[in-house]
Structure formats: C-alpha cells, structure tokens
Amino acid sequence: MNRFDQYPLVGEYDVVVVGGGTAGFAAAASAARRGARTLLLEEKAYLGGTATGAQIGQLMGFADGEAAAPQKGILADVLSGLQAENGTDGIVSIYLCGRKDLEIQVIPYVPETLMRVIHRIVRAAGVEVLLHTRVIGVDTENGSISAVAFHNEQGIQRVRGKVVIDASFHGSVAADAGCRWQAGDENGVLQPGTLMYQMADVNQDAYAACTQPQRKEIALQGIA
C-alpha cells in the first residue's frame, strides 16, 4: 500500500505541474497548448512566483551575447501581453553599477500586470489550476511517480499524471520521489533571496554624479 492510497483520487492527467512560478506556468501552458490535459498546482493565491510576489520588476538576460535576441513562444506572449497593458517598455539595456561594460538586456515590468498576463496565458491554454494548494508528497511505483498528494480547503486529495513536472521552489517533489538532490554549492551556500522594493523622491542627479567607488559601495548595500 502506498502512503496516500487512503485519500480520494480526484483526477488523472497527462501532465501535472507542481509550482506556478515562471518555470511552472510556462511548462503547464506549453503542455496544454500541445493537447495534454494539464493540471497546475500552486500553494499561493497567484501565479508567477517571485517574479510577481517579490516585486522583482525585471526579467533578465534577453541577448544573444551582443544584442537583444528576438523572443519566441511563451516569452513572446508574456512580452506582448505586458505591452498591451502598458506594463513594460520592452527590452531595454541596463548597466550594473552604472558601468558600460556590465550591460545586460532586461524586460522591466509592473508585477501586478505580469500576474494578470500569466493568468490569462494559462487560462487561454486550457490549464486546470488549483491555487492555495500545497503538495505534501508523492507515491511511486517502479521508479516513477504514481500519484501526487496535496492539501487545500477540500482536505487531502491526490491526482495521477503520466508526467509530473517539479517546478516547486524547493524541488521537494523530486526529492520526495527519491531523486538525488543538492542544496547550494559544495559548501551548502545558497543564493540569497531577492525581495525588491520601490523608492520615491530619489535625487537622480546626485546619483548620476556618484563616482564609481561610491556606486560600488551602494551596490554592495544591495541598493543598486
């Protein structure tokens, strides 16, 4: 008997995606667009993960090494959706610490607008979504996941998926299924979490007049 056999089986899907962040929603929408019956499980009240919930404000790295690369697929849909609501200026260049040699291409965006765009993309693709739903474990058979158990206001339930995609924040589904995992680098050091904030009444002329050492000191404080 598996751990979660006593709980009701409420659905069988081609694809079950755990985690509705940027990776999870894109995986779910892509699967559904290709005709797969897809379920997306997200423990929070919204999709987008830290991109929407932590006010990140910019999607980074849109270049082919020299210039901004053309966007395709889900990302192109995100960009066009943001532009339709005036939620972005498109792909722009920024300079880390104000240095011309540290140029990167980003999509600045309004987090609330991105949240709406993501929800629309998922709905249009036909993905079934359960919010406020926390995955608590999986059952396995012959080296594959046979059921995903989760908890929400309806209590503990489970679903089956021919394919289960772990897009959770911690990789907990893969770990519970017995996959090998590693937290951090060889010393267990993790990348610090990011939480953005907005500032008003900033003297931009004074900032522009800062020397490079001053800007470096500001950057080391996590401000720029």
Question: What spans do the regions from the language model cover?
Answer:
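Conserved N-terminal/central alpha/beta ligand/cofactor-binding core
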Residues: 4, 30, 36-37, 42-137, ...
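Short hydrophobic core segments
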Residues: 18, 159-170
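Core beta-strand elements of the Rossmann-like FAD/NAD(P) dinucleotide-binding domain
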Residues: 11-13, 154-163
